[in-house]
Amino acid sequence: MNTRPADFSAVQAATSLTQFRSASPLVHCLTNDVVQSFTANVLLALNASPAMVVDPEEAAQFSAVADALLINVGTLERSRAEAMRTAVNSAHQAGTPWVLDPVAVGGLIFRSEFCRELLAWKPAAIRGNASEIMALAGLAAQGRGVDSADDSLAALPAARELARQVGTIVAVTGAVDYVTDGERDIAITGGDSMMTRVVGTGCALSAVVAGFCSLEGDRVSHVAAACYVMALAGQQAASVSQGTGSFIPNFLDRLYTLRAEDLA
């Protein structure tokens, strides 16, 4: 039986958020076409600087000077895969932390093989839903596109194993988020079901995780803090929204106004 880990401390989340806003990291996002604008707006709301440089040669140059890199394979095709390869290789050589969002891995062969190939370049973190994390770890999963039929707690053992195999941090997200480095587990509660009814909240979270990975200090705590901040903003935005149309601006507003004292 899986026992749920202890909840993440709001005080730790507040410390990481303060550090993040002060650092204003430059996050290079090679993400999917559906969520580029929303992802950029989420990063801007948190005082980060987003960049979407997609040409293979330029992507390699830019990832070496960015503070963090996001690889999201949601709308993967062969030319974009080449840009992602060059960017990840360049980031790896430069010591730039990069995050993998393995969208729909397990259900589709090309992206599944591609994401497993990228693991050789040692991502700082991997963020996915339960089905994606289980599939990337080599276990059977019940995914349907970007959705997951698996419970995040049920995927925690797979997340631990994946973290150990790759030497990374894994965030498996769902009704409760779990962050692990293979030895240490953290639970993050909050959020709202409305976050699953709009496009891009998970993809944007992966970009925020990338930015938080660029911070000095305890990276496991920083990844958990990224999940905590997004879940809290989602929960608070949903409480004042009539539906998904009003949720998105309320979510961005809450991220923009959220301060450490609101957390601690």
Curated annotation (Swiss-Prot):
Assigned EC number: 2.7.1.50
GO biological process: thiamine biosynthetic process; thiamine diphosphate biosynthetic process
Reported cofactor(s): Mg(2+)
Keywords per UniProt: ATP-binding, Kinase, Magnesium, Metal-binding, Nucleotide-binding, Thiamine biosynthesis, Transferase
Main EC class the enzyme belongs to: transferase
Record pathway: Cofactor biosynthesis; thiamine diphosphate biosynthesis; 4-methyl-5-(2-phosphoethyl)-thiazole from 5-(2-hydroxyethyl)-4-methylthiazole: step 1/1
Transmembrane segments: none
MF-aspect GO terms: ATP binding; hydroxyethylthiazole kinase activity; magnesium ion binding
Binding site for substrate: M52, G200
Residues involved in ATP binding: R127, T173
Keyword Magnesium carried by entry: yes
InterPro entries given in the database record: Hyethyz_kinase (IPR000417), Ribokinase-like (IPR029056)
Reaction equations catalysed: 5-(2-hydroxyethyl)-4-methylthiazole + ATP = 4-methyl-5-(2-phosphooxyethyl)-thiazole + ADP + H(+)
Physiological role: Catalyzes the phosphorylation of the hydroxyl group of 4-methyl-5-beta-hydroxyethylthiazole (THZ).
Family of the protein in this entry: Belongs to the Thz kinase family.
Identification of the protein by name: Hydroxyethylthiazole kinase
Biological classification of the source: Bacteria, Pseudomonadati, Pseudomonadota, Gammaproteobacteria, Enterobacterales
Gene that this polypeptide is encoded by: thiM
